[in-house]
């Protein structure tokens, strides 16, 4: 999702921090060719890695144009990492 503009506020930053994720890490996952799945309620689930190799799930919504709003992010479970690696082959 190179070229996306990220929308956020203090509330988003605090929410990510509760999950141990820095906003820059969430953005890095989205910029690093993630595996993206769409949910029934128009949210997107991005499975990917940071530059440091950390595996994260980033939940986001697309806004107007190139704007993306990250809702939450967390570490992938071991099962999710395994599935991510399999689908990335």
Task: List PLM regions with ranges.
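Ribonuclease/tRNase effector modules and their secretory precursors
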Residues: 1-89
């Amino acid at each position: 999702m190179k070229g996306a503009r990220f929308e956020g506020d203090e509330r988003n930053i605090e929410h990510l921090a509760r999950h141990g994720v820095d906003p820059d890490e969430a953005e890095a996952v989205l910029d690093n060719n993630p595996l993206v799945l769409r949910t029934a309620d128009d949210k997107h689930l991005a499975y990917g890695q940071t530059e440091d190799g950390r595996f994260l799930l980033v939940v986001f919504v697309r806004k107007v144009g190139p704007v993306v709003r990250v809702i939450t992010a967390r570490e992938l479970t071991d099962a999710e990492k395994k599935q991510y690696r399999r689908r990335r082959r």
